Amino acid sequence: MEIQGNRKKTVSVVGGGLVGSLNACFFAKKGFQVELYEAREDIRYARMVSGRSINLALSHRGLQALKAVGLDEKIAAMGIPMRARMIHSVKGRKSSIPYGKQHQYILSVDRANLNKELLSAAEKYSNVTMHFEHKLRDCNVDSGTMTFLNNMENIIEKKADLIVGCDGAFSVVRKQFMRKSRFNYSHVYIPHGYKELTIPPRKGEFAMEPNYLHIWPRNTFMMIALPNLDKSFTCTLFMPFEDFEKLTTGDQVLDFFKTYFPDSIELIGEKKLTEDFFLLPPQAMISVKCSSFCIDHKCVIMGDAAHAVVPFYGQGMNAGFEDCLVFSELMEQYQNNLRICLHEFSRLRVPDAHAISDLAMYNYKEMRAHVNSKWFIFRKQVDNILNAIMPTTFIPLYTMVTFSRIRYHEVILRWKWQKKIINVGLFTVGTTGSVGAAYLVIKYLPFNKYIEHVGNCLTHLKGNAYLSRLWAK
């Protein structure tokens, strides 16, 4: 516990979303006086919950953070295990691609229900006070003062020893960082938006296999579906905005789905599909990078406020939860010395945040296009074989990201090294096979047949896209 004079130090957590409410638990457990401020009303009692609703994929990093505050088992019970991707072709064929080994899976969890549980967990600490409908207007990180506007339109001034900004991709706390010199910031809106649809239960049961993340990859766009506890599926259609703009009538939507997702129409229902498709406009997705994550020992940002990422690796929440865990581990290592912990946290997490942002962008290309290719399936099999033979040396990319706590930037370094080794190995095997075949041809074929065979081989090799890429390098 951190003491200043004869009082506990006060930590103000701005943002009562997933990362903010979990952070409140971490700081409260360490004995700090925690004040949590949330701009929205308390979602546990709200009639309608606004905001993002993309289903979340909870994996190892997030579970480890929850375990540190004793919430992992309770939250895991709220999720549905997904052990593999289920790929849906245009013709309706289905094929599965396991995420990892048989015991490895990710959990489909509902964002709102998870947020409610985390708020309730934080509220149980006697040293946590929650303030809902308190919108941060301004803060002075040098003095630790904050200005809020409450639901009565009253201006409220508050002060804290440490301000923790967990207020999302459009963080007000982060804006204060931008007033400082040597603060780097960039954001990108990707050209794709998303719409959400629902596959209802069929006769009280799941309409599709429940323990999969279902994917309809269509190269430039895709649809996914995650299972819910009520036996429904939440579908998300990711597509370029200009393609959404072409679909203006129910008939156009039906024609589009009949062309690209024909097997989903019966699952969703024609009437429900044409109604739900136009409930909301397509939503945008933003990726945020910045550095540093702290100002002196007075303020730190975490979660989307520090590193909003696109949702295609399922790591946004997990990375945010890992922020909380890493900071807690640093507090233990440095005996709650905020001056050391904040700067060390920023030093460690900035490269990892940038790395998972890049990986999320890469995985969108993989999910919507690469999973269709036989080469992708072959490489997955090669990765799995090498991992079985050398489990500590060769670890598949997805396994490193999702089922370990290897730092994200180290994941990329290891992945690039592994790719290089595998490519060299495959090239060597291919070359050895070609040389062996050539030897047999020379030894046993007549000369004129040999010349004809060599010509055919050269024609084949020139058309081999993979070998051409290797030679180009």
UniProtKB/Swiss-Prot annotation:
**Top EC group:** oxidoreductase
Q: Known Pfam families for this protein? A: FAD_binding_3 (PF01494)
State the needed cofactors, names only.
FAD
What are its E.C. numbers? 1.14.13.9
What broad class describes the main subcellular location of this protein?
mitochondrion
Membrane topology per record: Multi-pass membrane protein
Annotated pathway: Cofactor biosynthesis; NAD(+) biosynthesis; quinolinate from L-kynurenine: step 1/3
* InterPro entries reported for this sequence: FAD-bd, FAD/NAD-bd_sf, Kynurenine_monooxygenase
Q: Which SUPFAM superfamilies match?
A: FAD/NAD(P)-binding domain (SSF51905)
Q: Where are the transmembrane segments?
A: 385-404, 425-445
Question: What GO molecular function annotations does the UniProt record carry, in alphabetical order?
Answer: FAD binding; kynurenine 3-monooxygenase activity; NAD(P)H oxidase H2O2-forming activity
Which amino acid positions bind FAD, per UniProt?
V19, Y37, E38, A39, R40, A57, R111, L136, D304, M317, N318
Q: Which HAMAP family match?
A: Kynurenine_monooxygenase
Report the sequence similarity comment from the record.
Answer: Belongs to the aromatic-ring hydroxylase family. KMO subfamily.
Q: What is this protein called?
A: Kynurenine 3-monooxygenase
Protein source organism: Xenopus tropicalis (Western clawed frog)
Gene that produces this protein = kmo
